[in-house]
């Protein structure tokens, strides 16, 4: 598995599990909103009034409405520990 997906998959999965609303910005500037219904190596299925299959190579940014509970990537956890000390 590529190193990039070790961060990407748990993040997307937490957003999916908790049904957190997200804004997905595409590389062409279009903003899509909805909830992540499913995802795989190449696509994200975004559900709003309709379901849209969005290719990951077209995604620039994923902005959740809130941070998933109990989600703290290992690197971010180390950074937070330094801040709290």
UniProtKB/Swiss-Prot annotation:
Q: Which Pfam families match?
A: Hfq (PF17209)
- UniProt record, GO biological process: regulation of DNA-templated transcription; regulation of RNA stability; regulation of translation, ncRNA-mediated
Q: Which InterPro entries match?
A: Hfq (IPR005001), LSM_dom_sf (IPR010920), Sm (IPR047575)
Span of domain Sm: 9-68
Q: Care to name a GO molecular-function term for this sequence?
A: RNA binding
Record's keyword terms, sorted: RNA-binding, Stress response
Please give the CDD domains that the UniProt record associates with this protein. Hfq
Q: Which residues cross the membrane?
A: none
Q: Which GO terms describe its cellular component?
A: cytosol
Q: Which Gene3D superfamilies match?
A: 2.30.30.100
Assembly: Homohexamer.
- PANTHER family per record: RNA-BINDING PROTEIN HFQ
Q: What does the similarity note say?
A: Belongs to the Hfq family.
Under which name does UniProt file this protein? Answer: RNA-binding protein Hfq
In which organism is this protein found?
Idiomarina loihiensis (strain ATCC BAA-735 / DSM 15497 / L2-TR)
Taxonomic lineage is: Bacteria, Pseudomonadati, Pseudomonadota, Gammaproteobacteria, Alteromonadales
């Amino acid at each position: 598995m590529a190193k990039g997906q070790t961060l990407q998959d748990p993040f997307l999965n937490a957003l999916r599990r908790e049904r957190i609303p997200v804004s997905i910005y595409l590389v062409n500037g279009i903003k899509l909103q909805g909830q992540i219904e499913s995802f795989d190596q190449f696509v994200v299925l975004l559900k709003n009034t309709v379901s849209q299959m969005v290719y990951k190579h077209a995604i620039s940014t994923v902005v959740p409405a809130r941070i998933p509970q109990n989600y703290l990537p290992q690197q971010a956890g180390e950074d937070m520990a330094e801040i709290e000390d």
